[in-house]
Amino acid sequence: MPQPKKPRLVDTNVLLRYLVGDEPRQTERATSLMERVEDGSEELDIPPVVVAEMIWTLEKFYEVPRRDIAQKLMTIFSFKGVRGPETSIISTALRSYASTKIDFVDCYLASRANEQNMVLYSFDKKDFSRLKTRWQSP
């Protein structure tokens, strides 16, 4: 019996080409891939470091508003072929990122702590209290 295909990892630059479309040849290839991911014929694992790099690049370099960034990424995370151990955590973090002024990494940490019933060490009382995360100072 053949082994099921494992999801493949994707780099930030592929997702950027898909969202921004500033390199026509690469955009065409990235779009083709993402269409397969959308219909589930291809599976991708999008790690949190890639999401963080995407957000930073879209905010700082392309000056995309955070709500637009979150919406675009949440759309990608709704594709049938997006798989991975942290997909749920990242999706929750993106919703928090969209609705607050808290940076994505803190939203991700809060989402992970909440989903995995963990206590988070931080000096950032304000943000983690707003995200309703169990946290404590070291």
Locate each region found by the language model.
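Residues that scaffold the ATP/ADP-binding catalytic core of kinase and kinase-like folds
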Residues: 17-19, 57, 131
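Short, well-structured N-terminal submotif of metal-dependent ribonuclease cores
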Residues: 1-46, 61-71
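Acidic catalytic patch
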Residues: 22, 45-49, 70-98
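Short hydrophobic/aromatic patches on beta-strands that form ligand-binding or substrate-lining surfaces
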Residues: 54
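Short active-site oxyanion
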Residues: 40-44, 81, 115-119
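Histidine- and aromatic-rich ligand-binding microenvironments
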Residues: 11, 45-47, 102-103, 124-125, ...
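Alpha-helix capping/helix-boundary segments
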Residues: 14-15, 50, 89, 109, ...
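Acidic, PIN/NYN-like endoribonuclease modules and their adjacent C-terminal/linker elements
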Residues: 1-7, 110-138
